[in-house]
């Protein structure tokens, strides 16, 4: 599971500014979920070899300004979920009663806490951070989130404290094909999980996976071993208070990251929402095999069904590779067909692609449709090899590949997909250009060449 970094602090200390700085400068994606919150509060950060989630808990701590017990319980839930906590304070405002209350709670937990003194612009840094030593949380890290001052050093400290993302509480090799059931609240995730397990009539048990309480449910189907990653129950508990509600999104992300295949469930009676499209975009970016189940299909009138199918064409054009199934989790209609598709998708995700076959497919593509000219020169694509699994990654080497148009990249992706009969998985293409050995080098003239050049210049001037 990917680790979680939580930003804690009072209102207007710069949590959102720091969050925006981190997500603006990361190498991967940020997920926005307008259906859950009006603010950008959930981000996935990839920096070098480190990969983790960052959460702006602004709304939680703002609720705590009243210093009531219920608000502090929400803070406690945040602290339980996070691996590293960044406690932000405002050097201009100095120490406040709200800061002291939060610091008192942080001193009692057994988790890494970094004290971050923000807004050091226009102040003497050492003097600005001095008073915060009184919190007893170590040396304050002085930053300006607005301008990025000190943020690089802060991230180095954070990443040194994070657990490795591969550390989990269950043995991956023993679980078979891992399936994550993901979707918005109340779309029937728990019903689908119970239907899948009930159909097979096997004895199952809840195996706690990590400290984040994802539930791993092993079962067998037609002699094949599977593990359901069930996050459905997590979201039910999320209704209790806002603190857990926010982290339910992170739990969904972690379930997607852990899975081989994702079953994304949509409530067909409500149609496709923007939140559905955002979550599906996350699955695509992470690169997992995907099945989309439209639940409660049996309760729709014919005109409603046509409306949903039109929505699929309009809102999900980027998921042409994903199979869509129209099911009823409650009555079991279509669930068997849905499960039959899981194994072929897993096999596509883990397929070994030989370099010779990939290069042959590439050459066939070039023969049928050569790359376009760029600045009068044709882009050269030379050979291809596999770069990874789940999702399948194809690395293509050539010259000027950075100038290859998006349309031609899509053409290559479709041809590779068809050639290897990949089902239900995104295919990632990585283009690499050969390095120019002379780039950045200047020809150093000898003394003799310099004297000759000067004579030539004088000769030209005399003429």
From Swiss-Prot:
Q: Which domain of life is it from?
A: Bacteria
Classification via SUPFAM superfamilies:
P-loop containing nucleoside triphosphate hydrolases
Which family does the similarity line name?
Belongs to the TRAFAC class TrmE-Era-EngA-EngB-Septin-like GTPase superfamily. EngA (Der) GTPase family.
In terms of Pfam families, this protein maps to: KH_dom-like, MMR_HSR1
KH-like domain residues: 351-435
Identify the species of origin.
Answer: Methylococcus capsulatus (strain ATCC 33009 / NCIMB 11132 / Bath)
Give the encoding gene's name.
der
Q: What is this protein called?
A: GTPase Der
Q: Which CDD domains match?
A: EngA1, EngA2
Chain sites annotated for binding GTP 2: 183-190, 230-234, 295-298
Assembly, per entry: Associates with the 50S ribosomal subunit.
């Amino acid at each position: 599971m990917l680790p979680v970094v939580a930003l804690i602090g009072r209102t207007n200390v710069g949590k959102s500014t720091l969050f925006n700085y981190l997500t603006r400068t990361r190498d991967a994606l940020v997920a926005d979920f307008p259906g859950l919150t009006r603010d950008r509060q959930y981000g996935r950060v990839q920096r070098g070899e480190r990969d983790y989630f960052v959460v702006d808990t602004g709304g939680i701590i703002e609720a705590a300004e009243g210093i009531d017990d219920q608000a502090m319980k929400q803070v406690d839930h945040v602290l339980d979920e996070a691996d590293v906590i960044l406690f932000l304070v405002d050097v201009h405002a100095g120490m406040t009663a709200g800061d002291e209350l939060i610091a008192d709670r942080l001193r009692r937990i057994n988790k890494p806490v970094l004290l971050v003194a923000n807004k050091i612009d226009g102040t003497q840094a050492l003097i600005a951070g001095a008073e915060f030593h009184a919190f007893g949380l170590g040396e304050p890290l002085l930053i300006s989130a607005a301008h990025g001052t000190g943020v690089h050093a802060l991230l180095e400290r954070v990443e040194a404290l994070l657990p490795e993302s591969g550390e989990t509480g269950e043995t991956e090799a023993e679980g078979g094909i891992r399936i994550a059931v993901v979707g918005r609240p109340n779309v029937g995730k728990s019903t689908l999980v119970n239907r899948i397990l009930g159909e097979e009539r096997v004895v199952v048990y809840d195996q706690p996976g990590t400290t984040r309480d994802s539930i791993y449910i092993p079962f067998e189907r037609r002699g094949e071993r599977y593990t359901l990653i069930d996050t459905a129950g997590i979201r039910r508990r999320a209704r209790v208070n806002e603190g857990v509600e926010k982290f339910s999104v992170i739990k969904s992300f972690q379930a997607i990251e852990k899975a081989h295949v994702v079953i994304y469930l949509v409530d067909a009676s409500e149609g496709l929402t923007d939140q559905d499209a955002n979550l599906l975009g996350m699955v695509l970016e992470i690169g997992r095999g995907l099945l989309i189940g439209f639940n409660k299909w049996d309760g729709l009138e014919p005109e409603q069904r046509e409306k949903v199918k039109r929505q699929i064409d309009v809102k999900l054009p980027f998921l042409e590779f994903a199979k869509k199934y129209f099911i009823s989790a409650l009555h079991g209609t279509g669930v068997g067909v849905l499960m039959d598709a899981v194994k072929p998708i897993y096999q596509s995700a883990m397929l070994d692609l030989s370099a010779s076959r990939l290069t042959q497919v590439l050459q066939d593509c070039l023969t049928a449709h050569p790359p376009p000219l760029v600045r009068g020169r044709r882009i050269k694509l030379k050979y291809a090899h596999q770069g990874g699994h789940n999702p399948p990654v194809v690395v293509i080497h050539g010259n000027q590949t950075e100038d290859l148009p998006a349309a031609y990249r899509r053409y290559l992706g479709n041809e590779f997909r068809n050639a290897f009969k990949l089902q239900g998985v995104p295919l990632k293409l990585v283009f690499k250009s050969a390095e120019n050995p002379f780039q950045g080098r200047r020809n150093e003239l000898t003394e003799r060449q310099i004297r000759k050049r000067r004579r030539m210049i004088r000769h030209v001037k005399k003429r």
